[in-house]
Amino acid sequence: MSALTIFSVKDPQNSLWHSTNAEEIQQQLNAKGVRFERWQADRDLGAAPTAETVIAAYQHAIDKLVAEKGYQSWDVISLRADNPQKEALREKFLNEHTHGEDEVRFFVEGAGLFCLHIGDEVFQVLCEKNDLISVPAHTPHWFDMGSEPNFTAIRIFDNPEGWIAQFTGDDIASAYPRLA
């Protein structure tokens, strides 16, 4: 179940607000300029789908976003607990960073935790299957895939080069709850 928990940057252990209601989550995030929507990830992808299979299954969703925002490229990120690079990838994504473009993800399997550092608050968004999130360009954030990752998401970019991060050097992520 998708969830949003809001913390003060001054008190990372006690939440200010929490909800698992998709409409409430959407309202809170939209107020901060973050797009959050529930889409349908209802295609049968099989046991170990290739990136091509995932893209073909959800080309209609990609086309919708391209038509709306003019995105130029897309790919698929799929990580499982047996990935030999899972620890290195988790550490990389857990470092607060920004992008020069919106970070758009459509989760078609599993879950991951986006943590957005907006002003004096941190918004932890548990994204699961059916969730579309678009983090605005230049928003400091980090992503936690958990110690045993299990997710597949379509990533959509303005930049044809794909995922390019500018790390902030702030260790804020270490103070907040993580996925197990």
UniProtKB/Swiss-Prot annotation:
The record marks 102 as: May play a role in transmitting local conformational changes. Pathway: Amino-acid biosynthesis; L-methionine biosynthesis via salvage pathway; L-methionine from S-methyl-5-thio-alpha-D-ribose 1-phosphate: step 5/6. One of its GO terms (biological process) is L-methionine salvage from S-adenosylmethionine. The record marks 96 as: May play a role in metal incorporation in vivo. Belongs to the acireductone dioxygenase (ARD) family. Its EC number is 1.13.11.54, 1.13.11.53. Monomer. It catalyses: 1,2-dihydroxy-5-(methylsulfanyl)pent-1-en-3-one + O2 = 3-(methylsulfanyl)propanoate + CO + formate + 2 H(+); 1,2-dihydroxy-5-(methylsulfanyl)pent-1-en-3-one + O2 = 4-methylsulfanyl-2-oxobutanoate + formate + 2 H(+). The record marks 105 as: Important to generate the dianion. This is Acireductone dioxygenase. The lineage of its organism: Bacteria, Pseudomonadati, Pseudomonadota, Gammaproteobacteria, Enterobacterales. Fe(2+) binds at residues 97, 99, 103, 141. One of its GO terms (molecular function) is acireductone dioxygenase (Ni2+-requiring) activity. Its cofactor is Fe(2+); Mg(2+); Ni(2+); Mn(2+). PANTHER family: ACIREDUCTONE DIOXYGENASE (PTHR23418:SF0). Pfam families: ARD. Keywords: Amino-acid biosynthesis, Dioxygenase, Iron, Metal-binding, Methionine biosynthesis, Nickel, Oxidoreductase. Signal peptide: none annotated. InterPro entries: ARD, ARD_bac, RmlC-like_jellyroll, RmlC_Cupin_sf. Binds 1 Fe(2+) ion per monomer. Can be replaced by Mg(2+), but with lower activity. Changing residue 96 to A: Loss of dioxygenase activity and decrease in expression of soluble protein. The keyword Amino-acid biosynthesis applies. Ni(2+) binds at residues 97, 99, 103, 141.
